[in-house]
From Swiss-Prot:
Quaternary structure (record): Monomer.
Subcellular location: Cytoplasm
Role description: Post-translational modification of specific protein by attachment of biotin. Acts on various carboxylases such as acetyl-CoA-carboxylase, pyruvate carboxylase, propionyl CoA carboxylase, and 3-methylcrotonyl CoA carboxylase.
Additional facts recorded: Present with 1970 molecules/cell in log phase SD medium.
GO biological process assignments: protein modification process
Organism: Saccharomyces cerevisiae (strain ATCC 204508 / S288c) (Baker's yeast)
Pfam assignment, any one: BPL_N
Name by which UniProt lists this protein: Biotin--protein ligase
Taxonomic placement: Eukaryota, Fungi, Dikarya, Ascomycota, Saccharomycotina
InterPro entries: aa-tRNA-synth_II/BPL/LPL, Biotin-prot_ligase_N, Biotin_CoA_COase_ligase, BPL_LPL_catalytic, Class_I_gatase-like
Length: 690
């Protein structure tokens, strides 16, 4: 499910960053946290796939102006569908029934009713004087009282007090200001409530609404980058000592909305990067020397102080060491307590008498095991770059062309156990945990086939890569062909939902998984995403250089399911049938099998074209005879029958109205329209035959 953070008129870059990063820390991998604009919230079918919508800090009035078209959708999402609305600071003002901001100040006053009305009363602010737009001048570490009697301080800059919150039956006060605000917190009596509400939780229909005046989502790690010395000394230093309490509070309030949060505090901090280890297949050691020569050509030079070589690439800087044992301590210590996106990345090449790093340096990925299962004749994957904690296996290659162009053609696989800046479609980033195997393969393709002399369409690479991964899973060991995993066009892997399997009392062992008999839709979703592919294309030495970035849920179930879960389910069936149990799945073997299949499939495609590969693809995709609606053509119903061999578009034949078997003769080519939630809800169709 998605958690959508509004990023549009009224937001500030800093507030969006804090909200996104903080929510990812607490909610991933159970939810996919990403930013959206008004157009997405107005036009795309996001509600059925979303658990929460978040409005971060900024300015309330632009929210009112820009978001008027989506007010009714937000209210329906919360009250009717049981969704969660979260408003931090300006988002908190936006979610109330009335705003009174800086009353009496002719330069800043904003007063008026608000249409969301999740909180039935007034939000009044700034709760404390001194606020200035786009400034830290009025910022402070504000002390909050919690219901259990404890206190902690968090960042505050212009937020509201929720007036008379204790008088509303549907409102729970989660935190109050320890010091009386500078504005009236009550409209009765002396004008001050004994419990001036700073954070409230409202029950609205079937849903929950969390509104805050202060910024408990603000991470002190990002605030340390401020150049304001006074702010650093008076606010940031105070907040550093409060970080554990802030984390506990955030988890508490997010959990109260019904969201599923991580249980480990270590998960909410980006861990230190670890060294990257470069190794080769035993018979491909010459590729290591070729890469080092290429790096020198691109400017790698010796650093006699650090006893390493350095390369200042396009986005990142790199330090290259030689010798796993000799260099590990120095390479590791240079990464400690450094921001992952700012520190030079360290890469260790083997020493003269070394082949594979000692296992104690890579306890979560046995590189020797990987090369054991890699075909000896393989070029793809014959160089392995592994890091336990990396920024992103894709971004580090995609953003540093001098590094990328130093890699021998079609050789490298980059694997990471934990990504602190994992990258997905639309530029989304996240921290992926252990149990989600992230990898990026670097493959090179000619512009034309050496056999047929036909131009090669690189769009097919995403199909071929998913086909290779699917084949690797199903051939992992005897019995793995029963795992119900299939390809969702164009580049995702989906598995049958364990919940659906149990509800329907299905049996899969030795029966053959017939995915065509199961529904592919939202009414009763039978499938869950377990893997996605991101392809980045470069042009190097008159050839395509393609980065195939893929993450797959091996053992981590959040937010969907995993391969290991399905192995466990099938083993329950096998035990009842007195069959040998399936082995646990290991990232090392799976990655090697993926490379083996990719090598074979790519060669077939390059030499003989898409026609050679598509029959295998059709056997493992979800869409044979799927019926789709074409909104650009009067909501015509059409049946998917295949993929074009030139540009990889879907082929759909128009159905006679009311029939699921008879065709009109009209044929359409279909492609996605960029819809980030359900590509089959909004396909762009071009008629190619009538």
């Amino acid at each position: 499910m998605n958690v959508l953070v509004y990023n549009g008129p009224g937001t500030t870059p800093g507030s969006v960053k804090h909200a996104v990063e903080s929510l990812r820390d607490f909610l991933e991998p159970y939810y996919a946290v990403s930013t959206v604009n008004v157009k997405v919230l107005q036009t795309e079918p996001w509600m059925s796939k979303t658990s929460a919508v978040v409005f971060p800090g900024g300015a309330d009035l632009p929210y009112v102006q820009a978001c008027q078209p989506i007010i009714s959708r937000l209210k329906h999402f919360v009250s009717k569908q049981g969704g969660v609305f979260i408003g931090f600071c300006a988002g908190g003002y936006f979610g109330t029934s009335r705003v009174e901001f800086a009353q009496g100040d002719p330069t800043m006053e904003v007063s008026g009713s608000r249409d969301l009305r999740f909180f039935p009363g007034t939000s009044r602010g700034p709760a404390y004087n001194g606020f200035q737009y786009n400034s830290e001048a009025g910022a402070r570490a504000v002390k909050l009282n919690l219901p259990d009697g404890s206190q902690f301080s968090t960042y505050f800059n212009g937020g509201a007090v929720f007036v008379d919150a204790d008088k509303f039956d549907n409102v729970e006060i989660l935190a109050t200001y320890a010091e009386h605000p500078d504005v009236p917190s009550s409209d009765s009596g002396k004008g001050q409530s004994e419990n001036p509400a700073a954070v409230v939780l409202c029950t609205v229909g079937r849903g929950k609404v969390l509104l805050t005046g202060p910024h408990p989502e603000f991470n002190v790690r990002f605030m340390r980058k401020s150049t304001d010395k006074h702010f650093l000394e008076t606010v940031v230093e105070n907040l550093k000592a409060q970080e554990i309490m802030r984390l506990k509070f955030m988890r508490t309030v997010l959990t109260k909305t019904g969201l599923n949060c991580n249980n480990d505090f270590n998960y909410v901090r980006a861990p230190n990067l670890t060294p990257l280890f470069m190794a080769s297949a035993p018979n491909k050691r010459n590729y290591l020397q070729e890469m080092e020569n290429n790096l020198a050509h691109h400017g790698m030079h010796a650093n006699n102080v650090e006893l390493c070589s350095e390369l200042n690439a396009e986005t990142d800087s790199f330090q290259f060491y030689r010798g796993y044992r000799a260099s590990y301590d120095a390479a590791s210590s240079s990464l400690l307590h450094k921001e992952p996106d700012e520190v030079p990345k360290t890469v260790i090449f083997p020493g003269v008498d070394e082949d594979i790093p000692p296992f104690q340096y890579t306890p979560n990925f046995d590189m020797k095991e990987y090369f054991k299962y890699l075909n000896v004749q393989n070029t793809i994957g014959s160089l392995l770059l592994y890091g336990e904690v990396v920024t992103s296996t894709s971004t580090i290659l995609n953003n540093n062309k001098s590094l990328l162009s130093s890699i021998p053609e079609s050789t490298l696989l980059h694997v990471g156990t934990i990504q602190v800046s994992g990258r997905g479609r639309g530029g989304n980033t996240w921290i992926n945990p252990k149990g989600v195997c992230a990898s990026t393969a670097v493959v090179t393709m000619p512009l034309q086939s050496p056999v047929t002399n036909r131009n090669i369409s690189v769009v097919f690479v995403q199909y071929l890569s998913m086909l290779a991964y699917c084949k690797a899973i199903l051939s992992y060991a005897p019995g793995f062909s029963d795992i119900p995993v299939r390809i969702k066009w164009p580049n995702d892997l989906y598995a049958l939902s364990p919940t659906y399997y149990k509800r329907k009392n299905l049996k899969l062992v030795n029966t053959g998984f017939e995915h065509t008999k199961l529904p592919l839709g939202d009414i009763e979703p039978a499938y869950l995403k377990i893997s996605g592919l991101l392809v980045n294309t470069h042009f190097i030495n008159n050839k395509y250089c393609l980065l195939l970035g893929c993450g797959i849920n091996l053992t981590s179930d959040g937010p969907t399911t995993s391969l290991q879960t399905w192995i466990d389910i099938l083993n329950e069936e096998r035990q009842q049938l007195h069959l040998d149990l399936l082995p646990a799945i290991k990232a090392e073997k799976l990655q090697a099998l993926y490379m083996n299949n990719l090598e074979v499939i790519l060669k077939q495609f390059i030499n003989y074209g898409a026609a050679e590969i598509l029959p295998s693809y059709y056997e493992l995709w979800l869409h044979s005879n799927q019926i789709v609606t074409l909104p650009d053509h009067g909501n015509t119903q059409a049946m998917i029958t295949g993929i074009t061999e030139d540009y990889g578009l879907l082929i759909a034949k128009e159905l006679v109205s009311g029939s699921s078997t008879q065709f009109t003769g009209n044929v359409y080519n279909l492609q996605p329209d960029g819809n980030t939630f359900d590509i089959f809800k909004s396909l762009i169709a071009k008629k190619v035959q009538s």
